A protein has these predicted regions:
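Domain-length cofactor-binding catalytic modules of enzymes
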Residues: 1-252
Length: 252
């Protein structure tokens, strides 16, 4: 059983909060708040409370200008430590989510877990301080899963721990069509035909962007992972489920 699920938008929200904090850092806002508190304390002790607002307005003029684009602002100091702490919670939450899904399915289907493992992409390896975007960890001897598409399934492999590849491997097949392009260019009848032999109730307009035709071929994947992963086998799906919206609209 292969389950693909993340933090259910929590990680995105945390990232947006800290990107705003990074922007404020580069505007000097943290420094301004610190100086502001010092001014308030100092003027109150001197009995000059009536002058505080005027002084703060003058102080504020020295902050707020960015010398780099907002999307390139980065975190440092306590803000970085706070972010790493919170994002680790998001990653643990995502892992717990997958475990719970598996547990519920196994209970309903009267199945017993023999073994399990997690392969994570688009995350921060907190222990090694490696950011993996579009990549998974593939240290030597580690069992990994590389998903391809709804039809071809996933590659089960063992990591080689290749230092030249940052102890990583590709996280999946990779797209040849963006989600927008897939929905504009692909035909649902061809999509349905390509899934023949695999039981699924998820072939619909809402999942057209996940059609096998939107991804690179299996052969392309084997060529690029050979330096990072030893392939054990390809796990072919017999059943595939994706959230797919309204049945009435999607099966016209």
């Amino acid at each position: 059983m292969v389950i693909h699920s993340g933090s259910r938008n929590l990680g995105k929200q945390v990232a947006e909060i800290y990107q705003r904090r990074a922007i404020n850092l580069h505007r000097g806002w943290d420094e301004y708040i610190l100086r502001r508190n010092e001014v308030i304390k100092e003027y109150k002790e001197l009995g000059k409370s009536q002058e505080i607002n005027q002084v703060l307005e003058k102080l504020k003029e020295g902050y707020g200008t960015l010398d780099i684009p907002e999307d390139l602002c980065w975190l440092y100091g306590d803000a970085l430590s706070d972010y790493l702490y919170d994002i680790e919670i998001c990653q643990k939450y995502a892992m717990r989510n997958r475990k719970l899904i598996a547990s519920m399915i196994m209970e309903k289907a009267s199945l017993t877990e023999i073994d399990s493992f997690h392969t994570i992409h688009n995350y921060i390896d907190i222990n090694e301080m490696i950011l993996r975007k579009g990549a998974i960890r593939a240290v030597k001897g580690e069992k990994v899963l590389i998903p391809m598409n709804m039809k071809d399934g996933s590659i089960l492999g063992i990591g080689k721990g290749n230092r030249e590849w940052n102890y990583s491997a590709p996280h999946g097949a990779g797209r040849i069509l963006s989600r927008k392009q897939a929905k504009e260019m692909l035909d649902i009848k061809e999509y349905r035909k390509s899934m023949e032999g695999i039981y699924t109730t998820s072939i619909s307009l809402d999942t057209l962007d996940e059609a096998p035709q939107a991804y690179k071929s299996v052969e392309d994947i084997f060529d690029v992972i050979k330096e990072t992963v030893d392939v054990i086998e390809v796990l072919k799906p017999v059943y595939n489920y994706k959230e797919h919206g309204d049945e009435t609209r999607n099966n016209k």
